[in-house]
Amino acid sequence: MTPQVDSISSDSELPDTTEVVVIGGGIIGVATALTLAERGIAVVLCEKGIIAGEQSCRNWGWVRQQGRDHRELPLMVESTRLWEAMDTRVGCATGFVQCGVLYLEKTERDIAARETWLEHARPFGVDSCLISGTQANALLPGSTEHWAGALYTRSDGRAEPAIAAPAMARAAQAKGAIVLENTAVRGIETTAGAISTVVTEKGSIKCSSVVLAGGMWSGLFCKSIDLTLPQLGVISSVLRTRPMPNGPELSASGAGFSFRKRLDGGYSIAESRGPTIAEIVPNSFRFGKIFLPLAWLARAHLRPRLSRRFLDEWQQSRRWSLDGISPFEATRILNPAPLSGVLDRVRKSLADTFPFFKQLEVAESWAGLIDATPDAIPVISGVDTLPGLFLATGFSGHGFGIGPAAGQLAADLVTGNTPLVDPAPFRFSRFSDGTPIRPVVAP
């Protein structure tokens, strides 16, 4: 099932020329387009399906600094600041609330692991802290557990995935951006070795820069232009409840569950620290070696699965004529089936821990395919071998909250502005220049 997403009024006219084309209408793409449009840069966003149709509407809706890889923290601190002003910026509610985020822990060993993370986070000024089990129960009453403690970040929050990216897309349009849904980009053309044209299913657009923000599709697009982007996917299942009055305001996770209050009074619920389904596909063998450290880090939860998707990707074209149908038109929206066993398990775990949730009514459920890089941090970078091409992809399940700042950083790189943060950790070349690939946090 595809979650219901706020619609936008797609532009209909394909311009002959622009300065920047953004490929992909998830939160990263729309944040990039919005920032560029606000700076007076002519920008066209092309989305093969609908705005926020894939992972940008299927995620948990958490806006968190807590628990992130320290390489992401400077960008996430900036993103929190941008979220605080987002409703004013886009002229409507995005559901952003600084409700606080709580990681509930049962053992002293788990608390020690959180303390290690906290030591890395302190230099970035994040207001995360360890609290006692008694304090955790006071913040989040009604639990049957006696917690050893918790990691708590008061300034972390939540926003509404099905609303936020469309709101940003509409705001970009109001600033002059052209946003085209159902407009797949088939490829690019170059002049003297640099980007000069984007070819879509509806015609060509001359441009000087392209930002590829294609999520799970970015690796295939890169492959078609002789670039290697190591990328694999994991499946995440989520359910939405009907409104539940007088429930927790905090977003929280513990062993086996996570929950986030929604704008409509219901909750988005998913499994936390449980089995992670990684589908075996041809790229699993192509990129197996570089992903080994991440697989080892996630070994307690990683569950490889062979499915129909292996054959689908095996048969999928790696190259195609720019005047013929591309794979991006053949599949407008990735829509994996939610894993009912996972959702049954999380419902039981949550109800056992917080009896408030025993009477929940499921309104809908869905799954998303999360794109992951070998070190579980994104690529936000120019491509040295192809001037004019920039990548903003590989957010490894961390993209929604960091999206506004990631889009601004991508726009900074395109325009040559002083970068919002040091972009070096996110450079594309780290996968090929001998840099040790060391994941810190698994997706």
Describe these PLM feature segments:
Residues A31, I188-Q315, E329-A337, R345-T353, ...:
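Flavin-dependent oxidoreductases
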Residues W60-W62, D156-R158, I277, L369-D371, ...:
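Glycine-rich phosphate/pyrophosphate-binding beta-alpha loops
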Residues P3-T18, A31, R39, L130, ...:
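C-terminal lid/capping helical subdomain adjacent to the catalytic/cofactor pocket in oxidative enzymes
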Residues T134-A138, P304-Q315, W320-H398, F428-S432:
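Flavin (FAD/FMN) cofactor-binding core of flavoprotein oxidoreductases
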Residues E13-I28, V44:
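Beta1/beta-strand and adjacent pyrophosphate-binding region of the FAD-binding site
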